[in-house]
From Swiss-Prot:
UniProt record similarity statement: Belongs to the NurA family.
Source species of the chain: Sulfurisphaera tokodaii (strain DSM 16993 / JCM 10545 / NBRC 100140 / 7)
Keywords from the named record: DNA damage, DNA repair, DNA-binding, Endonuclease, Exonuclease, Hydrolase, Manganese, Metal-binding, Nuclease
Cofactor(s) required, per the database record: Mn(2+)
Chain ranges passing through the membrane: none
EC number: 3.1.-.-
Outcome reported for the amino acid change (mutating residue 131 to A): Lack of nuclease activity
Induction: Part of the nurA-rad50-mre11-herA operon, these genes are cotranscribed.
Keyword Hydrolase found: yes
Protein name, UniProt field: DNA double-strand break repair nuclease NurA
């Protein structure tokens, strides 16, 4: 019962508070030196006015006794300064039965729509901004055997071939493969334009501490600047498509952290080149509170709000729970 939780919390209050406080004085001094070695203060006051594309997606799933209802959508916008214009969008709605790995598959569907929009319209601007990370787009699954069944698909086609598979486990693998095929085509065509931006990275790869790199940088730095770029490689173990493997396996990319505006949040950026100050000069002039406005705008457009969810349920005649505390799985 929740009463037991409160009793446990009171008995361990001091211990938990110490862990929340993060660091002692000795650790503070050591980390300050560590960060000083890797953080370069750099404020871009002028910057370059370039055209950029920003892409993001939204998703919603509803678990029912009959299966999983899902909705995904994605949008691409073009920005010149703070003038943002929608270019194209895609949406899907369907039911997964019985619904195993539903969240993972719906997330892959959303991601696939994003990548397809980038591939279709990548020639319309100098840079293409995605929310998230390269590794997340590739997937962290490890596959002992490759799947070549989808290697001959037309990646420019609007069709999602994986949805034709009824077996849920196979569909999941096909979705990973289809994402990787579109991703490899995107890299082949627009490698130098691609930029991934993450605002919630939990990575510890730079400082190798048990606290995230972002948390440490936000704790010990306030000015705008960036960290040294780290070269990374896409692991061949994570590539399930033989055709995609020719482009993606062991491909190098660079990651670094930056703060675009003084006192604002730290962002993690990944690209296929190490031109850090150049991309900062592109992003700084179009940022609000330290985050690129085009990505903020497209995120707002695709987000499935609470009001949207209620309206969708009404349109689909999904009845509302009579008892609010009743578990959704039994509804």
């Amino acid at each position: 019962m929740i009463k037991d939780v409160y009793e446990l919390l009171l008995s361990r209050k001091n211990e938990i508070e110490k862990q929340i406080s993060l660091l002692d004085e000795t650790s503070n001094n050591l980390l300050k030196e560590k960060i000083k070695e890797k953080w370069k203060e750099y404020c871009q006051t002028q910057g370059k006015l370039s055209t950029v594309l920003a892409i993001d997606g939204g998703m919603w799933i509803k678990e029912l006794r009959s299966g999983i209802v899902y909705i995904v959508n994605a949008e691409i916008v073009k920005a010149e300064g703070f003038n943002v214009t929608p270019i194209d969008s895609k949406a899907l709605i369907g039911v997964l039965r019985p619904g195993n790995m539903a969240k993972e598959r719906v997330s892959l569907l959303m991601q696939l729509l994003e990548l397809k929009l980038g591939l279709k319209h990548g020639d319309k601007a100098e840079y293409i901004l995605f929310d998230g990370s390269i590794v997340k787009k590739i997937g962290k699954h490890k596959f002992s055997t490759k799947i070549s069944l989808l290697d001959d698909i037309d990646v420019m086609d609007d069709k999602i071939y994986s949805l034709e598979e009824n077996d849920e486990e196979l569909m999941h693998k096909y979705l990973v493969a289809e994402n990787q095929l579109v991703m490899s085509a995107l890299i082949s065509k627009y490698k130098g334009k691609l930029v991934w931006i993450s605002k919630n990275s939990k990575s510890t790869e730079l400082f190798q501490e048990n606290i995230s790199d972002v948390s440490l940088l936000e704790l010990f730095t306030k000015n705008c600047g960036y960290t040294i770029g780290i070269e990374k490689k896409i692991s061949s173990e994570n590539i399930i498509s033989p055709k995609a493997s020719t482009i993606l396996s062991n491909a190098s990319f660079y990651s670094f952290y930056t703060r675009l505006k003084e006192g604002e949040k730290i962002l993690k950026i990944e690209m296929f080149n190490n031109e850090i100050e150049n991309i900062i000069s592109i992003l700084s002039p179009i940022s609000i509170k330290g985050y690129p406005y085009p990505l903020l705008k497209v995120h707002t457009d695709v987000k499935v709000s609470r009001q949207d969810r209620e309206r969708i349920k009404q349109l689909l005649n999904i009845k509302k729970k009579d008892i609010e505390w009743w578990p959704s799985q039994l509804f």
